[in-house]
Amino acid sequence: MMPLSRSRLEFIATILQNVLNLGLLTLGLILIVFLGKETVHLADALFVPEQASKYELVEGLVIYFLYFEFIALIVKYFKSGLHFPLRYFVYIGITAIVRLIIVDHKTPMDVLLYSAAILLLVITLWLCNSNRLRRE
């Protein structure tokens, strides 16, 4: 089998990068639609006087921030020269675990394990932002 030339490999990489960019752009637009739907849902939950709606409101707020963080991640990808910064994934992970604690807090051991996971992610975030792991 004949190896591909450098120009062909670059052409393939360019095609795949464009497909990735188009997919992320589509995902961003879908997330904006979901963000709008979540805004309407939050407005509905805000004006319902029942106690159960307060939990729904808090859960909706955290979901809202997850959508917002994913959209911010996609924006950052395009602004930073087609690169995903690691710390944005860590922020999303922390927010997702906080949502899980709010929604599913059945046993104290689960909450403790989720809290330990958040602590691990915060330590990861600290290491990523420290000078030890900074890129040149």
Curated annotation (Swiss-Prot):
Transmembrane segments: 15-35, 55-75, 83-103, 108-128
Record flagged with keyword NADP: no
Stretches assigned to the Periplasmic side: 36-54, 104-107
InterPro entries according to UniProt: P_starv_induced_PsiE (IPR009315), P_starv_induced_PsiE-like (IPR020948)
Residue numbers on the Cytoplasmic membrane side: 1-14, 76-82, 129-136
Pfam families: PsiE
Keywords: Cell inner membrane, Cell membrane, Membrane, Transmembrane, Transmembrane helix
Location of the protein in the cell: Cell inner membrane
Protein topology in the membrane: Multi-pass membrane protein
GO CC terms: plasma membrane
A GO biological process held by the record: cellular response to phosphate starvation
Recorded family membership: Belongs to the PsiE family.
PANTHER family the UniProt entry points to: PROTEIN PSIE
Protein name: Protein PsiE
Origin species: Salmonella paratyphi A (strain ATCC 9150 / SARB42)
Gene that produces this protein: psiE
